[in-house]
């Protein structure tokens, strides 16, 4: 975290503050004690109960593209996912609302950007094709959270699930 040649988090992410570094250093100095863990929480207190009715707010947290391909219904998204306020939110829980001011910014390999605003369920999606591999970040007035590696799958919730998969720590989270 404090390296001048290879800082963590890597650029273009925002550098850790001195207070954040002190917390990590204290944890390391204490011998990496195991935390008590965290239970999933539906921060919004709202759960989707509408089934597969075709609403843009349907099935937050679920793998959108996988479902649309399997059912052969609905739009053919190139990018789709859900933004949440915390890392471990259950499937079908509404995510970050539009009032969060969040924008999901996708930058294709060709340098073109696609900016998406999450809806009332936190869902974002687009049928616009993106040149891969692409980069992604979530931006608010309070900062940005950037993926550290380029991606090739636009089905964001496949990896950004309750527990996380394929190296993702959990949900797509607001900065």
Positions of PLM-derived features:
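Aromatic- and Gly/Pro-enriched helix-to-coil junctions and flexible linker segments
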Residues: 1-73, 80-82, 87, 91-102, ...
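Short Cys/His-rich "knuckle" micro-motifs
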Residues: 74-77, 167-169
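Glycine-centered loop-to-beta-strand initiation motif
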Residues: 81, 118-126
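Short, acidic Ser/Thr/Gly-rich low-complexity loop/linker segments typical of extracellular
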Residues: 109-121
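A short, solvent-exposed beta-strand micro-motif common in secreted/extracellular proteins
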Residues: 132-141
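Short acidic/polar inter-strand loop motif in beta-rich domains
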Residues: 141-146, 164
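Extracellular beta-sheet/turn segments enriched in Thr/Pro/Gly and aliphatic residues
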Residues: 151-175
């Amino acid at each position: 975290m404090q390296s001048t040649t290879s800082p963590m988090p890597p650029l273009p992410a925002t550098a850790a503050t001195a207070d954040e570094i002190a917390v990590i250093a204290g944890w390391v100095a204490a011998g990496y004690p195991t935390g008590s863990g965290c239970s999933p929480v539906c921060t919004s207190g709202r759960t989707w109960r509408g089934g597969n009715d075709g609403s843009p707010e349907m099935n937050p947290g679920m793998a959108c593209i996988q479902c649309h391909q399997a059912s052969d219904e609905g739009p053919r998204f190139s990018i789709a996912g859900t933004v949440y306020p915390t890392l471990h939110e259950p499937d079908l829980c509404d995510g970050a609302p539009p009032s969060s001011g969040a924008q999901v910014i996708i930058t294709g390999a060709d340098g073109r950007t696609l900016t998406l605003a999450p809806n009332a369920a936190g869902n974002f999606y687009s049928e616009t094709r993106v040149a891969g591999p692409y980069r992604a970040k979530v931006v608010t007035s309070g900062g940005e959270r950037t993926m550290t590696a380029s991606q090739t799958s636009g089905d964001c919730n496949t990896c950004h699930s309750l527990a996380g998969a394929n190296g993702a720590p959990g949900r797509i989270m607001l900065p």
